[in-house]
Amino acid sequence: MPTHHQIVVNGVRLHYVEVGNPQGPLAVLLHGFPEFWRAWERQIEPLARAGFRVVVPDLRGYNLSEKPPGVSAYRVGTLQEDVAALIRALGQGRAHVVGHDWGGIVAWALAIRQPEVVDRLVILNAPHPARARQVARKPAQWRRSWYIFFFQLPWLPERFLHRFGAWALHGTNPQAYTDEDRRLYREAWDQPGAATAMINYYRALRRSRRARRESASGAQVRVPTLVIWGQRDVALLPELADGLDRWVPDLRVVRLPRASHWVMRDEPVRVNNLLVEFLSGALVEASVPT
């Protein structure tokens, strides 16, 4: 069973759960929007059984972690520093980093800016910043990204999250999210200040000059990387997973044609096998057929 902890890193108090061999290789799993640590509940035990020390934080602003005020507290650079500081505070110089959605955006940033703390990188349905800039010009992606523009409004997105957030949690697998899952998610969203903090990620992204410079410069990733992409993502075009070897030389891409954005929920067994194989160094193919 996971144990729950609180730790202060980079000036913010983070809640995290931990399970597995304390002496094993550290694997840090980063959730996305609008989730929290339980996003990875079907991956935690399989990774622990494979010998990893598994640590899963609530990102700043989420669930039981601290919720600093102001949009600037949620810039990608700050989020990336949180994770780097967490890895160091856990007594490790490096860790495997796995990120989905916003957790993937943070994981990309960490691998780009602080590769010395990343051993292996796994990204699930989160765009590399340079590829995102290319695809963002396409009207088809604009239509899918409507919520990013909506989230720039004051107070209204928070109301939307409280009333309709659970609507988004539907994968292609009917068992992706249970009624109990949705109850726990609503409980996390109802933590004081959580809704505004979560939506501030999007507000900060739109205002981040550094993120725009980085996406324009084609930031390189120099660590072994696995990208797992659910092809039935309604928010992100499948082509966001194309052409990544331009920026990521040591790359493997696995496309799951039946999975949605919630890929680790739709196909947990497949994802778990890929994670264990890749993080153990056993997945060597340049691209794994679907």
Where are these regions (language model features)?
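Flexible "cap/lid" subdomain of the alpha/beta-hydrolase fold that forms the substrate-access gate
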Residues: 2-5, 12-14, 19, 26, ...
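Alpha/beta-hydrolase-fold serine-hydrolase catalytic core, especially in secreted/extracellular enzymes
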Residues: 282-290
